[in-house]
Each structure stands twice: as C-alpha cells, then as structure tokens.
C-alpha cells in the first residue's frame, strides 16, 4: 500500500520538477536576448532623467539671464530671431519656466537642420543657439528608442521588451516558494552562503519585489514601439477626428509631425490625429501658397502676442506654442506631461487656433482622453521622472536595480556554466508526460498580446525543431 501511494506522489514531484526546469529554460533563453537591452535602456534612461540639469550645465552662458522688471514682447523677440536667421523658419516658441532662464525659439531650414535659439526675454537679444543634433538627450533618446539604426532598432527593442514580460512572468513562477530550499531564500539575502547563492538571492528577490515596477516601465515603453504601440494600442486610442474636430477641415499634417527630432512633444493619443486647418483668411489676401517649411507668415495672421494672450486666458502657464507652417496652418498651444511642460497629467491640454481670426478650433483636455490614454499621460510622467524630485530619484534607484538584476543574472550563469566545455550552460531539460496546459495558455496569451515577442518565440521554436535538435553539435552546445 505504501509503495502504491508513493507512486502518484513521485510522479507529481517529477512533473513539478519538469515544469520548473522548463520554466527556467524559457527564463534563461529569454534573458540571453533581453539582458543587453535591459542594460542599455536602464543606462540611457538614467541619463535622460537629468536632461534639464545636463543641458543647463552645458549651455549655462546661453540659457542663463539676469531677471529685470520689464519684458520685451514675444512678437519682437520672434522678429529678432527671424532677422538673425533668415534662412530658417521659426516653428516653435517655448517660454522660460523660471525668471532667470532664456526663452526658446525652435528654427528649421529646408535641409531639416534644427536649432534652438535662446532669447533674453528682458532685452530681446539672441544669446546663442543649441544644435538639437548635439543634444545629449537627443542622442540618448535615439539609442533608447532605435539603437541609432531606425526601424530595425525599434523592432529589436520591441522584441526585447515583449520578451521582458515573458522573463518577468517566468521569473515570478520561479521566485514563488514551493519547497524548503526555495523558502530559505525567499525575501532574504544570504551573504554567507557563497557567491552563487548571494547572486541568486539578489536576482530573484529584487526581480520579484520590483516586478510590478518593471512591468509598468515595459508597458509604458512599449506604447512608443513601432508595432505594438503605433499599429495597435496607439491606433485604437487616437482621437477620431470627427469626434472633436467635427466638420472642421483637416490638413495632411499630424500632431506627430509637430515634434522636433526625437523629442516627444505632443500627447501620445493625439500623435496620429490630423491637425485642423485655418479657414478664416480674409478674401483680399492673394499671396501665393507656399511650402510648409518655406512659410514665413501671412500679413493677415494674428501676432504671436495675441495667441499667447488667448492661451493665458484659457489657463495655460507652461506650454509650447507651435507656429503655423502654411497659409492653412494653425497656432497650436500644447501643455502636456509627455512633453515635460507640466507634471500633473490631469492638466494636459492641446488647443488649436485659426491663425487669422484666433478662433479656437479644437480644445482637447484630460477629460477627453480614453482610459489607456490617461494611463499613458500619467505613466509617462512617472516614466520620465517629471512628477517631482522624489520621482526622479526613485527612477534612478529603479534603473540601478534593473542593472543589478541583469548583472546578477549574468554572474549566476557564469558561475554555474560548465568550465572548459563548448556548451551554453542552459538549465537541464527533463522529459514530461503530456502538456503543461497553464504554461501553454500563458505563452499563447503573451504571444498574441505582444506579437513581436510572439514572432520571435515562434522563430526560435522553428529553429529548435528544424536545426538545433538535428545538428548534434548545436544540440550539445545549446543544451
């Protein structure tokens, strides 16, 4: 009787052991791909958190001003910029957030070069320029988003972030205690049990405790990705133009086109929506239509001072003001957490004004956002460390923790790998009777929810079946 009752227990123990090692193998192979990207994202993200501080340190002489009682009208500052840079088009005005910092005007030329012109608001004098292409933030943001190789880099990062969620789910399964051995290290750091146990405790407990934080960063980051972000969730959360725009005519210009370089200046849920057009142009103006980037402004258009007054009457304080880019273009005033204009996403606002009459064409606020758009608006503020100094410091701590989790994972593998052997040192593989249904369902859900990660998993499984298991040297090296 004892022997017969022991058989099911042994079989169940064998099944659980097989599942554990299978999960560990998935965790291991996903980690091989994800860890380099996790290190890159954490390092570049840490630098981007201090964009304002780095920029002020690099360009202190250009940006610093001495506060005075009277300010020069913004229209006069704009005219000074136009005269100083006749081959450039002024595209944006950003008022200084503090009294001792210069106002900024963004300018672009026909070749696409983009500069920031710093203007003393008290004297109206140009203090200097900042080349957007020379910005440390722009460089870090481009690496963070595309690895400097465009769409290919974007896709690789999206695969890494998607597999990062698989890494997280499998890691949680491995972390939850199931026997005395796993309970011994649960929520404990054992410093006296050797380097491998120490690395394991740091890796598992940090990863487990910060799993929700990591998931938040992965999801909010994926929302910018080219497939899951732009083609799926962003497309479904972009405003249908008829909802807010009504019968107002649309241009071919989207809100995303208003961004400068790698900077995300417009709200995420508006990026794919078209910008409305100005239609209140007086009939007597017979000026020829001009190309967007060559547009120098219409004599009948309202001055920038008029638009600023209207924006302030709506409640705008910190904001970016985008100038019309054609005779049918509009003045756009945007204050949003994604662009770093404000820290409270509930105060997000984007307003479009007819450049001739000043009529408010579109006014989009937090209340108009979808549920996921609200998550993005709030999430991006936290993601970028814009809410407070504490938020910024906390994000640095999180980045350092993610780096430590990645490094301890590599060290664990290095310690346990077979020495003097041409093998990868993957966790052992055990035969299993039947299919682990919960694991299969979880994997299918992740593949469907994050298609780039799913595509990568399908390719790996195909290679494993077609090549790795058929070539003995590869089979030995990878197992």
Task: Name each model-derived stretch.
Residues 2-479:
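Conserved histidines in hydrophobic membrane contexts and catalytic metal-binding motifs
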